[in-house]
């Protein structure tokens, strides 16, 4: 539902009287920036603005640290003026080691979705390996540690658990599928990831019910180190 973004764009368009940079940091479908620009152009024929995609990459529980010490700063615009201004704005973070990437607006929008879809894929992969480890009587943590020691893979998001969840991964994996569908592209892998994740949740639910002998009434269930 992009009604709030488009509504805010209409409010902005009615009040622009000098050059402004309109920055979108929210996770939005690719081409949202294009639509925002169209709305603004209806009231501003002289184009007193630049629409920029500047996605945030903050983890839950680590938002302040991730903002102060980001891995990268992504600026989505092909215009020189906002690029120069934003590069100066983010220079304190870049001086601390953050990578600065200036790319197209659509690419910046897609980078956010593609990143979250990849992390969801990584979680789903180790969960499937965990299923295999149970059959082989192997400790999945040993396997994930061994894999993570490879610099090409890394150990983050490689811990087996119930399933991925939260406010981002389920929404973003489905959203990137929707974008692919709109542009007639088939993301077979992401479809499989979503299905596997759903199966993982069902599998663990069945195990819990079995352990409790189908007696769930008045039972308290706690997940430790869960990525739900």
Model-derived features: where do they sit?
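Structural/interface elements that position substrates and couple domains in central-metabolism enzymes
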Residues: 1-228
